[in-house]
């Protein structure tokens, strides 16, 4: 929702302050295929394994989402 940096529905999330819906100090992310222990995973880390004729998808190092490869 507007103004929220993370999903504050789970008070047990170590990356997100459940009272403010903001990332805790030092956290880059709270969830996502490219988020590990509140930090973005390194660029080039496989986040989605290829299926069929598709290719693997990789983290970009600057977001928690797993961008789809353009091929």
Curated annotation (Swiss-Prot):
InterPro entries: Disintegrin_CS, Disintegrin_dom, Disintegrin_dom_sf. The lineage of its organism: Eukaryota, Metazoa, Chordata, Craniata, Vertebrata. This is Disintegrin halysin. GO terms for molecular function: toxin activity. Pfam families: Disintegrin. PROSITE patterns: DISINTEGRIN_1, DISINTEGRIN_2. The disintegrins belong to the medium disintegrin subfamily. PANTHER family: ADAM A DISINTEGRIN AND METALLOPROTEASE DOMAIN, ADAM METALLOPROTEASE. A motif (Cell attachment site) lies at residues 51-53.
